[in-house]
Swiss-Prot record:
Keyword Iron listed: no
Organism: Bacillus subtilis (strain 168)
Residues with Phosphoserine modification: S59
Gene behind the chain: rsbS
Listed Pfam families: STAS
Protein name: RsbT antagonist protein RsbS
Amino acid sequence: MRHPKIPILKLYNCLLVSIQWELDDQTALTFQEDLLNKIYETGANGVVIDLTSVDMIDSFIAKVLGDVITMSKLMGAKVVLTGIQPAVAVTLIELGIALEEIETALDLEQGLETLKRELGE
C-alpha cells in the first residue's frame, strides 16, 4: 500500500507543514524523515506544524511527533505547533510528551507570527 506524503512547504527561512488527514505509523515515520531532510537541505531555522485537521492520535504517532520536535530542535529549527484539537492535547499530555518548551498557537497565522517572534524577525 502506498502511503501519502505530507507536503512540506518552504516560506523564506521556515518550513510549513499542514497535516490534512489522520496519520498511520508508516506515514508518520516517512514525514519524520522527510522533514528532517528538508531542514537539512534548506537550512530552515523554523517549522510550523499545523494539526488542525487531526482529531485523534495514538501513542505511536504522539511519540513520533515528540521525536520530530526534538530532532528539529537538535538541527537548529524552532518548532511551533498549531491547531491542536482537544483530544490530541489530552493524548499528548497523558503520554508524557514534553511540550513545556514547545510554542503553540491556535491557527497557522498565529503560528507564523509566533515563529517570527521566536526567531527575532
